[in-house]
UniProtKB/Swiss-Prot annotation:
Residues 1-20, 72-93, 156-190, 260-268 are extracellular. It comes from the Eukaryota. The keyword Nucleotide-binding does not apply. The chain crosses the membrane at residues 21-41, 51-71, 94-114, 135-155, 191-211, 239-259, 269-289. GO terms for cellular component: plasma membrane. Disruption phenotype: Mice lacking all but one V1ra and V1rb gene (12% of the V1r repertoire) show a lack of chemosensory response to a subset of known pheromonal ligands and changes in maternal aggression as well as male reproductive behavior. Putative pheromone receptor implicated in the regulation of social and reproductive behavior. It comes from Mus musculus (Mouse). This is Vomeronasal type-1 receptor 40. One of its GO terms (molecular function) is pheromone receptor activity.
Amino acid sequence: MNKANMLRTDKDMQIILFSEVSVGISANSILFIAHVCMILGENRPKPIDLYIAFLSLTQLMLLITMGLIAVDMFLSQGIWDSTTCQSLIYLHRLLRGLSLCATCLLNILWTITLSSRSFCSTKFKHKSPHHISGAFIFFCVLYMSFSSHLFISIIATHNLTSENFIYVTQSCSLLPLSYSRTSMFSAPMAIREAFLVSLMALSSGYMVALLWRHKKQAQHLHSTSLSSKASPEQRATRTILLLMSFFVVLYILENAVFYSRIKFKDGSILYCVQIILCHSYATVNPFVFICTEKHIIKFWESKCGRIVNI
């Protein structure tokens, strides 16, 4: 992609991207602060609250990093050096991977928490946070190693004229790699993402089947007219299904745009669309948590009430 074409990119795309980043940073900050305060105020915080707090922190850092990259894409005069380019692009790639990993593990932990109360599952529930934490550390090391090639393939190119370089920002470009090297780095990442998305789909499907069976048992034992209010389990199911469906749709759209960019090699608009889709989940999912978890709303209502009383 030529830098001149990037500068002529539709201004609407720039506004959408900066608006998305700003809204996402605000929403994740609200979610993170609420969960940290609730965790510090409890003697035994729930594992799910810890993972939601970590997910919101990861997404917050991801969007801040993307904001810095977007500034260099549209507003900067190309003043970054190679170290800055490599560090920020590497950090952004790492945070993207950790966000996907944290979302997957949170989905699994949520499924385990809502599973049946058999002896095996109850015993596993107590150990699951430790297993999931170990899995997360493993994926952290894996992501760091998979993204390490960016330190040699990202360079600062302030006066880019060659079409061989791949545009990243006004300051940074990606060195062209051979087909074998590209496959060596892209294949493990594709397998990793497919594995995590498959785990999310399986855990969500299992939980939906589990709660559907629970609902049938409840209808058999009790009259459905006793209460029309949704149970906490049903609300949790709706939340997970909504997040999972939204994630899958964005994942499909993002990959479709990516392959379209490969076909139309000089697509500055497609580049912006891919970036917007890539960060839409990190922007939207905090609102889903805030709207579906009543204790977060009550927390902020109490804080706002105290400020008003003062």
